[in-house]
Amino acid sequence: MERVIQETDNDAFSCKISAITKRYLPSSEQKKIGNYEHYEDIHLEFCKEIKSRSRRKYANITKACRHSLPVMNYGTYLRTVSIDLKLTQWLKNNLENPADKVQVINLGCGSDLRMMTFLASFPGVQWLDLDYKDVVTFKSTILRSNAKFRASLQIEGDLPEEPSSIENVITDRYQLLPCNVTDDEQLIPILKKYTDFSVPAVILTECVLCYLHESKASQLISTVTGLYKQGYWISYDPIGGSQTNDRFGSIMQDNLMESRQLSMPTLMVFNSEDKYKERFPGKSEIQTMWDYYQNHLEDSERQRLKTLQFLDEIEELQVIFSHYVICTTNWRI
């Protein structure tokens, strides 16, 4: 099951490269907040490193770029932009003074490269990426082997003669470590060693909770929110839909099982906006991607998106994006 879940990271990264090459990303609003001028270069550089290490992964990327449908690029755009902007706003609110410190903990980070932009933008940020060992080994090998990434993340030390022996990245402000985040015996010692429970923490779970069994997801939320005195959780996931005639969730489950033998155990448990946000403590806010598209994007940005690829089925966007949510939670002990 772990291996199958890890494959979804390659899908997500492939979709992001497609959205970047077709100019969906970065968005106009991302460009306004700064430090996105190297966004494309960072991702294409990482993609080049993938090509030299895994033909299969690179083939998936090129296939996604050749055959990506507008709805997929819109989805990647909304997913990426909504998370980035909510994270940016929270960091700005909590880093008003030069001495302020916060930490970002990305649970199930995969190939996500957000840390490059945010570490450059916010000197008061510490960043911790966690994922399964195989994912971390592959990502850390690229980060530690590439001169541009080493300079950006201030990675020191010689590269091991055997790249496969690289299992982490540890610098003053950035750590990438292997961890099964659903195992408290692995997770808690890492958080104790590399984070400060008295410092405000942002927790990112991007399409992570949906792949966990309900008990494991609840345990993860309870463990993490119980450790930090103040925190902000950003979670992005699909929801199955709660209306009687809504078959989105069941169709999605059938397709995943048929194509990958993969399940989303809580897709139909937390199948509505209200049910999804109730799983978190503290004050939570939730928004579907359709609502985000309709009410958050400026008219000029929606018009820009329409010029990138021909899209004739706006109703399809509404159906799909009404079943993806971004949920944010503030808590304080």
Curated annotation (Swiss-Prot):
It holds the Pfam family LCM. It comes from Kluyveromyces lactis (strain ATCC 8585 / CBS 2359 / DSM 70799 / NBRC 1267 / NRRL Y-1140 / WM37). Its EC number is 2.1.1.233. S-adenosyl-L-methionine binds at R79, G108, D131, N180, V181, E206. Methylates the carboxyl group of the C-terminal leucine residue of protein phosphatase 2A catalytic subunits to form alpha-leucine ester residues. It is an enzyme of class 2 (transferase). GO terms for molecular function: protein C-terminal leucine carboxyl O-methyltransferase activity. One of its GO terms (biological process) is methylation. It comes from the Eukaryota. It catalyses: [phosphatase 2A protein]-C-terminal L-leucine + S-adenosyl-L-methionine = [phosphatase 2A protein]-C-terminal L-leucine methyl ester + S-adenosyl-L-homocysteine. Keywords: Methyltransferase, S-adenosyl-L-methionine, Transferase. Gene3D superfamilies: Vaccinia Virus protein VP39 (3.40.50.150). Belongs to the methyltransferase superfamily. LCMT family. The gene is PPM1. This is Leucine carboxyl methyltransferase 1. The keyword Methyltransferase applies.
